[in-house]
UniProtKB/Swiss-Prot annotation:
Name of the protein this chain belongs to: Proteasome subunit alpha type-4
Species of provenance: Caenorhabditis elegans
Top-level taxon in the UniProt lineage: Eukaryota
Pfam family, one: Proteasome_A_N
GO cellular-component term (any): cytosol
Length: 250
């Protein structure tokens, strides 16, 4: 019976479900883990690099954190080709707003624009939803630092900390337990802790990309952490884990 409805993007099933949207969300659940953590001093994002191969050229590897404007960036989980189309839309809207009004586009307004476009693709026959979720990070003069998440249906929500991609439910559960209004350094350590406990592989610097969005001298700055900095965070977490194990044995 379900086959009557799951091949059509625009038809609801008798249970009130849009199967194609659900399938798009399922595709995202198999993508690399991406998480964002809001702190009092900025925002930390961390994204898993999946399918790392020793023959891949690091200089041309697909990035996981994308700059959209001077004040806004994002990370994605899902079908990369779909993400590239949406990122181009986001950059065009942000640039058009800046050219028209002489200031940066508010973060939530940019998110709303894209979600309107994503929702439109759930109502057009002959097209499919975009198989990608995004985490948006940014700063504006209205609300300061902001973290948003959107899914293929066009829904978006604001978060203090969240995760998309594989193992996202376990990661969100851990974030609920551990998030306590951290500063920037604590947010970095929390990101490493969550990835350490939820990834299916041993955490290493070549398997994760981390970036920090902060304000400096009146400007928004997005800095990607170097391999050495990520290694240091992982080593610090390993040390804490060993100390905790030793304390439990005593």
């Amino acid at each position: 019976m379900a086959r009557r409805y799951d091949s059509r993007t625009t038809i609801f099933s008798p249970e009130g479900r849009l199967y194609q949207v659900e399938y798009a969300m399922e595709a995202i659940s198999h993508a690399g883990t991406c998480l964002g953590i809001l702190s009092s001093e900025g925002i930390v994002v961390a994204a898993e690099r999946k399918n790392v191969h020793k023959l891949l050229d690091d200089s041309v590897m697909t990035e996981k954190v994308y700059r959209l404007s001077d004040n806004i960036s994002c990370t994605v989980a899902g079908i990369t080709a779909d993400a590239n189309i949406l990122i181009n839309h986001l950059r065009w809207w942000a640039a058009s707003y800046r050219n028209s009004y002489g200031e940066e586009m508010p973060v939530e307004q940019l998110v709303q624009n894209l979600c309107n476009e994503k929702q439109r693709y759930t109502q057009i026959g002959g097209k499919r939803p975009f198989g990608v979720s995004l985490l948006y990070i940014g700063w504006d003069k209205h609300y300061g630092y902001q973290l948003y998440q959107s899914d293929p249906s066009g829904n978006y929500t604001g978060w203090k900390a969240t995760c998309i991609g594989s193992n996202h439910q376990a990661a969100v559960t851990l974030l609920k337990q551990e998030y306590k209004s951290p500063n920037l350094e604590e947010a970095k350590q929390l990101a490493i802790k969550v990835l350490w406990k939820t990834l299916d592989v041993k955490l290493a610097s070549e398997k994760v990309e981390m970036a920090v969005l902060t304000r400096r001298d009146g400007k928004t700055v997005l800095e990607e952490l170097t391999t050495k900095e990520v290694d240091a965070l992982i080593a610090e977490h390993e040390k804490k884990e060993k100390e905790a194990e030793t304390a439990e044995k005593k």
